Regions:
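Residue-level "edge-of-site" marker
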Residues: 82
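Conserved beta-strand-loop surface patch within small alpha/beta domains used
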Residues: 1-76, 85-137
């Protein structure tokens, strides 16, 4: 993801992470993903906007990612995009254009050295931090 974000500078990059959930979900948990998510594929998507402040996933790359994920029995676990010159915090546009309910939104800030990535749960009007950690690479 960081390589893609660097390559696509000065514009935002975007993509999807897919894999499988492992273990049983805690029905009483406040967070939808309080269990192990094993990421098995990363799908870099084409930013149709080609903009440093906006992204829009190009339809063909999104369809190809969806087809591959379905063929491999994977579910989309997260969407990611970069903020080339701002903090890794959702913008108003990120909230308004969020069509991925129930998946973590990772934002990579290229404004830091090294780049800083944060995860968020988004709704149309609000966002809250998502607890996550890499436990195996």
């Amino acid at each position: 993801m960081l390589g893609q974000a660097l390559t696509e500078l000065p514009n935002e990059c975007c993509g999807l992470l897919a894999g499988r959930m492992e273990g049983e979900a805690d029905a009483a948990a406040a967070e939808p993903l309080l269990r192990l998510a094993r990421v098995l594929r990363r799908y870099p998507l084409v930013n149709k906007k080609a903009s440093p402040t906006r992204y829009l996933s190009e339809e063909r790359s999104l369809i190809d990612a969806d087809r591959d994920a379905r063929q491999n029995n994977l579910e989309f676990l997260a969407i990611y995009h970069s903020h080339p010159t701002s903090e890794p915090v959702p913008s108003r546009t990120d909230l308004e254009d969020n069509y991925w309910d129930g998946v973590i939104q990772f934002i990579i800030s290229m404004n830091h050295v090294p780049p800083l990535m944060r995860g968020w749960w988004l709704s149309p009007t609000d966002y809250r931090p998502a607890d996550w950690q890499i436990i195996d690479v």
